[in-house]
Amino acid sequence: MELQFLGTGAGQPSKQRNVSSVALKLLDELNEIWLFDVGEATQHQILRTNIRLRKVTKIFISHNHGDHIFGLPGLLSTRSFQGDVGPLTIYGPPGIEQFVKVSLKVSRTKVSYPIKFVELTKPGLICEDKGFRVYTDRLDHRIPSFGFRVVEDSHPGELLIDKLAKYNIPNGPLLGQLKRGDQVTLADGTVLNGKDFLGAEKPGRIVTIIYDTRSTPSIARLAKDADVLVHESTFAGDEAKMAHNYYHSTSVQAAKIAKQENVKKLCLSHISARYMGNKAKKLESQAKKVFPNTILVNDFDQINIPMKGSEK
């Protein structure tokens, strides 16, 4: 599991930062990639990575402001040229389906694969697929905006080989069944329950994506115990009043949430163009005073998310 940031800027593209998009790479887990927001020129950014659009199966849109959706029609069109790509699902606020369909219709663009739209209107579970669940909750922005919480199911514990030694079970299907927690019957009639021979479950990983919003209680619910929290940081910590007036957040507000909700790593994104170059480091340094494991991400940065217990 890995995050790759395709755009980390706010409002408009700059020479240093493109507008919002981040890819959650689940290649080892599902052989899929999920995108969160698709700002203008996201597909150009993808060309500079090893991401293949045929692997993109789900797109989650936080809200319908242009810097988060203007790249969507072009990306969907280009995906048609990737061969047999399979269906794609887009999750987003009311209006995203209309935006996509009108854009494709007016440009007379035909896509070669089915697109399913899931409209976000209320908090809760929106996706459950092959060991992963995605939850959403409303944020506080000028227009309807949603945050996302991706939760991986727990993994079975290790098979306790020493505990099984007395049964002299050879390598083969029976051990595989026991490792899955199944019940098996040995040649002598002994019945073994696989769950009795497994170590403690390994908790799944949690990734939370919070784009445009000002401080609001729903962020805490989405961020709780996250391995990685991606949080918008449009303004510096000493500009909380301005952030509130413009329905955005500061780096310090993001850090406080990370500390309060037992987050492991905080990634600051959605950086205003007013913080160019080294000025952006101000946001990171302010946040680190509150939550040390903070990183200010740049376009194309990659964040590995190891299994719990395997961190180096």
Swiss-Prot record:
Keyword tags: Endonuclease, Hydrolase, Metal-binding, Nuclease, tRNA processing, Zinc
InterPro entries found in the cross-reference section: Metallo-B-lactamas, RibonucZ/Hydroxyglut_hydro, RNase_Z/BN
Cofactor info, note text: Binds 2 Zn(2+) ions.
Active-site residues from the entry: 67 (proton acceptor)
EC number from the UniProt entry: 3.1.26.11
GO terms, molecular function: 3'-tRNA processing endoribonuclease activity; zinc ion binding
A Pfam family annotated for this UniProt entry: Lactamase_B
Enzyme class: hydrolase
Domain of life of the source: Bacteria
Catalyzed reactions per annotation: Endonucleolytic cleavage of RNA, removing extra 3' nucleotides from tRNA precursor, generating 3' termini of tRNAs. A 3'-hydroxy group is left at the tRNA terminus and a 5'-phosphoryl group is left at the trailer molecule
Binding-site residues for Zn(2+) 1, renumbered to this chain: 63, 65, 141, 212
Cofactor dependence: Zn(2+)
SMART domains, sorted: Lactamase_B (SM00849)
Residues at which Zn(2+) 2 binds: 67-68, 212, 270
CDD domains attached to this UniProt entry: RNaseZ_ZiPD-like_MBL-fold (cd07717)
UniProt subunit comment: Homodimer.
Family membership: Belongs to the RNase Z family.
Function, in words: Zinc phosphodiesterase, which displays some tRNA 3'-processing endonuclease activity. Probably involved in tRNA maturation, by removing a 3'-trailer from precursor tRNA.
Annotated protein name in UniProt: Ribonuclease Z
Gene: rnz
